[in-house]
Curated annotation (Swiss-Prot):
GO terms classed as biological process: endonucleolytic cleavage in 5'-ETS of tricistronic rRNA transcript (SSU-rRNA, 5.8S rRNA, LSU-rRNA); endonucleolytic cleavage in ITS1 to separate SSU-rRNA from 5.8S rRNA and LSU-rRNA from tricistronic rRNA transcript (SSU-rRNA, 5.8S rRNA, LSU-rRNA); endonucleolytic cleavage to generate mature 5'-end of SSU-rRNA from (SSU-rRNA, 5.8S rRNA, LSU-rRNA); ribosomal small subunit export from nucleus
Gene3D superfamilies tied to this protein: Leucine-rich Repeat Variant (1.25.10.10)
Name recorded for this polypeptide: Nucleolar protein 9
SMART domains in UniProt: Pumilio (SM00025)
């Protein structure tokens, strides 16, 4: 299918041939039907011009894009994607690498002028506008949003333009955050064009435009996700999982096929996790309050509950409940939360001691695949007093059935995350005989939430251990417990599958082992599963008295199985949690690392295993590091040829350990101290420094990102020999070196030259460590070239 005919979104079913043929015949019959004579005194051959019954075209409400313009923007899209995917640094510092991109982008913006609405509603160009929006600076974003002003209701309901508006709301957060701090771009030569509103004011005007028809927009299949992005813009602290809220799985999969959506001018390499808590203007909080009050006024309780049951409106209502809780309006009668929970908030404020009657509507939400996400937000956001009522009405007494339900078990797990000690006791008593059934159906969420909540409250030590042993059918803390948890199998099933795998021919077992990491993981019942890894990581978060049975089981695992666990992408995270948890005694960690000595050459010869080995190396002290390094002497050449092991061996610096062990120990001790200091600096929270705003595209894209440590070249002081030279002779940088020429010149000027008369006295105050280094240099052979140059024979 040609690209211009492709459309994004849900496809409509084609009408049957008979119906289309009948409609076509009917239209032809209407077209050739003789017209009635006009009774206006004019001749019969004078006919009035045909009038269009409906001039508004919902597919192109602002007109179609010219084919030449569309072809031009296809070229723009191809060029932008090529620059993003094949970024090449020419290495010329004299030329601006973004100059060509900037000129190209400005030309595309000029071509887009006065065609913004047509391009936004076009099936092909809407995606191109989304890609270009990420590269716009603050000023261009304001101009682009201002060009769409007055038509946002139509655009929000449009199949393609709604995605453009949603993208604008997402990228507007950075600009609004800068405007809140008082940073505005310079507008040169724009005095005659009138006053351009700030993006903050434009957002408020958009809200005023959408506010009268809010009730209908929430139920619109295209405008609902636009409202979600708008609510998250007005109240950014509402939800952390913004991507899951804004897009469905189908939309996210389609978006991933469109390539990278990032700024063309910003370097996002090494970008840290974005801070979700931003400062917003006070007007945004008031506007959020107006949205909540508008829905409360115009919607009845039945209409709110209809939204909760709708696949389109339920995700938007989930965001609205988060905004309502953020504003502190949830704990009020007739609130949105009160309507969805069938008056639980009103009953709490009435002061009645008797429980209200349980509602079948809430019970339906528990088991509905779409609405259960809304109920998860309710049990997480509702006030503490209302949560107790919800627990008594809908969870207590029915936990065994809900935990086994394929949908309701997720809501139960979310409710357990805020349960009290008394409620945990109810869970342990009700699910005492059903843990094993949940494991057989691979539903581990309730057990994981129970373990994590027990760790937070530091309670239910005996019940937690009994729940784990009952779930997997393991009586003692041995290696089978770890294998059963990682494979999410009961002990009976694990032994049966293991016996079946042992009876197979060796060639077939080797084939299954090779494919274990691929898509055939589900076909192998003994493969490690992500659910089991997460469950075991939750067990490792328990306090020390409760975690002892897990540590005993980990110690019983054979070394060969430990290597397999370290080589698995999901199961290896267990040992990451094991080394990072401060509640686990250091003695247990050292014992686990010592057991791997003699097998590190197998561990590091793998993509995942080398990462685990780096974790172990970072935890070890100098004594353990030396034992690990000496165990790899005979495997040095083997690991040097390994694709993954060579990096680990290079970090060990085995040559220095063989020649000068004491110097190697000092170097490792110093690296350990530097790593601890760097970790302490990273843990200190620092406020992000505001970046200067200029008029270049993409200059402000990372201004609101959290403060990151400046990327520095690896300091030469890491090498002890360089340190000794710097401490004794001072740092001397040649003019041809790749350093700061100004700094090098100043240092050379400040460093006094030693006098020749004091040359003899210098040896008396010489650093002994430096003398040892000079002695080693003198003792080294002068001709140590591996490939000495051959002398040319003279012609005779």
């Amino acid at each position: 299918m040609p690209r211009e005919n492709r459309k994004r979104g849900k496809k409509h079913k084609k009408p049957k041939e008979e119906e289309s043929f009948g409609q076509q015949a009917h239209q032809e019959q209407q077209y050739f039907e003789p017209e009635q004579p006009v009774e206006n005194g004019e001749p019969s051959w004078i006919r009035p011009a045909p009038r269009d019954q409906d001039d508004f075209n919902p597919e192109a409400p602002f007109g179609y894009v010219d084919q030449d313009v569309k072809a031009y923007f296809r070229t723009v899209d191809v060029q932008i994607r090529d620059w993003q995917e094949n970024a090449v640094d020419d290495g010329n510092e004299d030329n601006d690498p973004n100059e060509e991109k900037r000129l190209f982008f400005v030309a595309a913006l000029n071509e887009m002028r006065e065609k913004e609405k047509q391009l936004a509603t076009d099936p092909d160009c809407s995606v191109i506008l989304e890609r270009m929006a990420h590269s716009m600076d603050d000023f261009v974003r304001r101009v682009f949003v201002d060009s769409l002003a007055g038509s946002f209701e139509i655009l929000a309901k449009h199949r393609f333009a709604s995605h453009v508006v949603q993208t604008l709301f997402v990228i507007a957060r950075e600009t609004i955050a800068r405007e809140t701090r008082g940073f505005f771009p310079k507008m040169e030569g724009q005095e005659d064009s009138g006053e351009l509103r700030t993006l903050t004011q434009l957002t408020l005007d958009i809200c005023e435009e959408l506010l009268p028809n809010l009730s209908s927009l929430v139920l619109d299949p295209f405008a609902s996700h636009v409202l979600r992005a708008l609510f998250l813009l007005l109240s950014p602290n509402t939800a952390a999982e913004e991507d899951n809220i804004l897009r469905s799985k189908k939309s996210s999969a389609w978006k991933a096929k469109q390539g990278s959506m990032k700024s063309l001018f910003a370097d996002n390499k090494g970008k840290q996790k974005e801070d979700t808590r931003r400062s917003v203007p006070a007007e945004f909080t008031n506007m959020s309050r107006r949205f909540i009050q508008e829905l409360r006024t115009n919607l009845s309780g039945n209409e709110v509950r209809a939204m909760a049951a709708s696949k389109v409106a339920s995700p938007t209502l989930k965001v609205l409940l988060g905004v309502e809780a953020e504003l502190g309006l949830s704990d009020e009668p007739e609130s949105l939360l009160d309507h969805v929970t069938m008056g639980v908030i009103s009953h709490t404020h009435s002061g009645s001691t008797t429980l209200p009657e349980a509602s079948d509507f809430v019970g339906t939400l528990l088991r509905d695949p779409a609405s259960s996400h809304l109920l998860e937000a309710i049990v997480s956001r509702c006030p503490e007093s209302s949560f107790g009522t919800l627990w008594q009405l809908y969870f207590k007494g029915t936990l065994a059935r809900l935990a086994a339900h394929p949908v309701a078990n997720f809501v139960v797990a979310k409710a357990i995350e805020r349960a009290s000690v008394e409620q945990l006791q109810d869970i342990a008593s009700e699910l005492e005989g059903t843990w094993n059934k949940n494991i057989r159906t691979s539903r581990t969420g309730v057990l994981r939430a129970f373990i994590e909540r027990s760790a937070v409250l530091n309670a239910m030590e005996k019940e937690t251990k009994q729940a784990v042993q009952s779930a997997f059918g393991v009586e003692s803390a041995d290696a089978n417990l770890i294998h059963c948890i990682l494979t999410v199998l009961t002990l009976e099933d694990y032994k049966a599958y293991k016996a079946e795998a042992t009876s197979k021919p060796k060639a077939q077992r080797d084939g299954n082992q090779r494919h274990r990491r691929g898509n055939q993981q589900d076909s192998d019942p003994l493969a490690f599963k992500t659910q089991g890894s997460i469950l075991l990581q939750a067990l490792l978060k328990l306090p020390e008295p409760q975690i002892n049975f897990v540590l005993e089981a980990l110690q019983q695992v054979p070394v060969e199985d430990k290597i397999k666990i370290c080589h698995d992408p999901s199961a290896s995270r267990v040992y990451d949690a094991f080394l990072e948890n401060a509640n686990i005694p250091s003695k247990a960690k050292r014992q686990w690392i010592m057991e791997l000595i003699g097998h590190y050459h197998e561990l590091v010869d793998d993509r995942i295993g080398s990462r685990v080995a780096d974790r172990c190396w970072a935890f070890c002290d100098t004594y353990l590091k030396e034992k690990i390094a000496r165990s790899l002497f005979k495997y040095e050449s083997q690991l040097a040829g390994s694709f993954y092991g060579k990096f680990f061996v290079r970090n060990l610096n085995l040559h220095l350990l063989q020649r000068r062990p004491e110097e190697w120990r000092n170097m490792q001790s110093q690296k350990k101290i530097q790593a601890e200091q760097a970790q302490a600096r990273n843990q200190r929270s620092s406020k992000p420094a505001p970046a200067a705003v200029n008029g270049t595209p993409g200059a402000e894209s990372d201004a609101t990102a959290p403060a990151k440590p400046a990327k520095r070249k690896r300091a030469k002081a890491d090498n002890e020999i360089e340190e000794l030279f710097d401490a004794t002779l001072g740092r001397k940088i040649k003019k041809a070196a790749l350093g700061d020429g100004i700094g090098a010149t100043s240092e050379n000027k400040e460093t006094p030259k030693p006098e020749k008369a004091k040359k003899k006295d210098k040896s008396s105050g010489e650093d002994p460590s430096l003398a040892a280094v000079f002695g080693a240099i003198k003792a080294a052979p002068k001709h140590d070239d591996s490939n000495p140059k051959k002398k040319k024979k003279k012609r005779t």
